[in-house]
Amino acid sequence: MESCPSENKEKAMSLLHSFYCWGHVGVVLLSTLFFWFFGIADWKILALLWVIIPVCNGILFCKVPIAPLIEEGETGMSLRELCKNRIFWILMLMMMCAGASEQAVSQWASTFAEQGLGVSKTIGDLAGPMSFAILMGSARAFYSKFGDRIDLDKFMQASSLLCIVSYLCISLSPSPLFSLIGCSLCGLSVGIMWPGTFSKASAALRNGGTAMFALLALAGDVGCSGGPTLVGFVTGLASDDLKKGILAGILFPILLIVGIVSLKKAKRYA
């Protein structure tokens, strides 16, 4: 996406990532309908049906033209150069926190809805993960439309603050309904984090190349795994109190704000 000849790459990056959210919504909705009609016992059949998606993606990807990230005559940064660059490590921290902030709530949203509201898994999936994904996609679509009028740094900082508020709402509110609203609000707040960090990386390290984006994606995936793991670990220590587990996850949006501020300072003195 960063190599495409578009005028505003930040908007394009946000629009691209919004389709991940719409895919998320589709998977939750169709899977919920499958379980509603055929029961959870047949989950293996559903897994086989979903295999069609990556197979089709693989075929389509073979036909996608990919423009080079580095212009002709220039050389990208080596892995060694990246590892010596302070800005790169700040970006890695931001990506890890972006993934963790998103998945720490998303992965537990269905369970939280079932336990907090006492509803069935069907309602829990629709009220939890699907509402989270809809609002996350809406945030990305919003930035893709109005991104040229919005300062990305301020938008990411405001989103991180909103994420902190949503975590507090989920974990401290005495009302299960307000806690569930906090889950949805979290989806809205994390929308810009992942694509925004990619865009900031492209602007900060113009010769980062494919290696940089691959490592940033790896950091994001580590966060996607580490966030829910931390929540689950703390929940177990707190006698299966999921609210306390999610409260521990507030560390990630706080660190993301630290990363955004540190990146601005590092670029100023670079």
Would you name each region that the model predicts?
Residues M1-P5, I192-L205:
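Intracellular juxtamembrane helix-capping segments at the cytosolic ends
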Residues E7-I66:
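Helix-loop-helix hairpin linking two adjacent transmembrane segments in secondary transporters
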Residues L30-G39, A113-E114, F146-G147, G232-D240:
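Interfacial helix-cap and linker-helix signal at transmembrane-aqueous boundaries
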Residues C56-P65, A248-A270:
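Multi-pass alpha-helical transporter architecture, strongest
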Residues I66-L91:
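Juxtamembrane intracellular "pre-TM" segments in multi-pass secondary transporters
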Residues N85-M130, I134-S138:
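Extracytoplasmic gate region of multi-pass secondary transporters
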Residues I150-T197:
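C-terminal transmembrane helical hairpin of 12-TM major facilitator-type secondary transporters
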Residues R206-A238:
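A late C-terminal transmembrane helix in Major Facilitator Superfamily
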